[in-house]
Swiss-Prot record:
HAMAP family: Ribosomal_uS8_B. Belongs to the universal ribosomal protein uS8 family. Keywords: Ribonucleoprotein, Ribosomal protein, RNA-binding, rRNA-binding. GO terms for molecular function: rRNA binding; structural constituent of ribosome. This is Small ribosomal subunit protein uS8. InterPro entries: Ribosomal_uS8, Ribosomal_uS8_sf. It comes from Bifidobacterium animalis subsp. lactis (strain AD011).
């Protein structure tokens, strides 16, 4: 059976694994998911990620990051633009999750960027997710 929203599935796997204090989480691989993982690693929300060969296709293994006392790096993660209702924002109306404490992942013509990078470049796009 095909999955309706693989990005929401990825975000849910990350949220659930983080809440359950798992060290790693596996998910089906795609370039879009890899780009999201790159942003999460660059912003300090995950420790690392690798693409591994599976029985069928590839899987993306994400190593989660925790604080010195076991506190989660990803406190919350929310899918914004969905297949049934796409959400777009111009460069002058980009969201600032939690007043700038979180990040918004934006899909632009220049690839996936955070809202801060979009503001610097003056471009808008589709709001994929909020992470805080």
């Amino acid at each position: 059976m095909t999955m309706t929203d693989p990005i929401a599935d990825m975000l849910t796997r990350l949220r659930n694994a983080s809440a359950a204090k798992h060290e790693t989480v596996d998910m089906p691989y795609s370039k879009f998911k890899k780009n999201i993982a790159e942003i999460l690693k660059r912003e300090g929300y995950i420790a690392d990620f690798t693409a591994k060969e599976a029985r069928v296709g590839q899987t993306l293994e994400v190593t989660l990051k925790y604080g010195p006392h076991g506190e989660r790096s990803i406190q919350g993660i929310k899918r914004v633009s969905k297949p049934g209702l796409r959400r777009y924002a111009k460069s002058d109306a980009l969201p600032m999750p939690l007043g700038g404490l979180g990040i918004a992942i934006i899909s632009t013509s220049s690839g996936l960027l955070t809202q801060k990078e979009c503001l610097d470049r003056g471009i808008g796009g589709e709001i994929v997710a909020y992470v805080w």
